[in-house]
Amino acid sequence: MFATLKQVVGENWHWRRQVWNLAKIDLVKTYRGAALGKIWLFAKPAVYILVFWVALKFGLRSSSDVNGKPFLLWLPAAGVFPWFFMSDMITTGSDVYRRYPYLVNRIKFPLSLISTFYTLSLLIIFACMMAFTTVVALLTGVHLGRYMLQLPLVMGFMFLFWVAWSMALSPLSAISRDFSNLLKTLGTPFFWLSGILFDISGWPRAARLVASFNPVTWVVQSVRDCFIYNKWFFTDWESFLPFLFVLLIFVVLALHNYHRLYMEVPDVL
């Protein structure tokens, strides 16, 4: 297992420039043919904030703040925006080998890089959304304290976990379409059971403990710690330790599945 870890880390380090270039190419492909191009990176969060504002202000007539911060910052910015990233990773990120078969069939191209550059391309979009949210919050007079400094660290943990997720499950999805289709059905349950639309702090302790093993819940809560709750995410050991445990499990699964199946994937595809 340690030999596989050394191999994967070595491949990603040796090919780091190619990984960055592939991530940028994948990002450009997303908006290729659009007249506004990269402006869509910021148009999407702007539209969602506008829609939520109209729905809450005139539809539900709800304007209650959360910890002194606008509800718009709590739900769409610190809840739905992280979900955009994770939703793509749950569905497409767990089946990247079928998404890029031309790279899989290249003899000298390491398969571990595919998960890395795909996750990186989505993380760039997420970073743009967070930057947009921060600018809008500051322009509207919302005070953001020193706890925002931990946001890059949260994004680093997001990157590590979802790369491991992709490496662990993509070989299985490449071999079995049934497994791939099963994973694609998980998007809706994850969305509704991860505290994106509601605050899980009111749950019974046992339910919160179970939810803490859900990586989607940890990401959403950690982003809200940065923007809303003004606390360091690593001081909440009841949620941080379970996340680290799940991260370790997926790293082990990723190394195991990669070692056993990476030679078979090109033949299957």
Report residues per predicted region.
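Hydrophobic transmembrane alpha-helices and immediately adjacent juxtamembrane helices
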Residues: 1-269
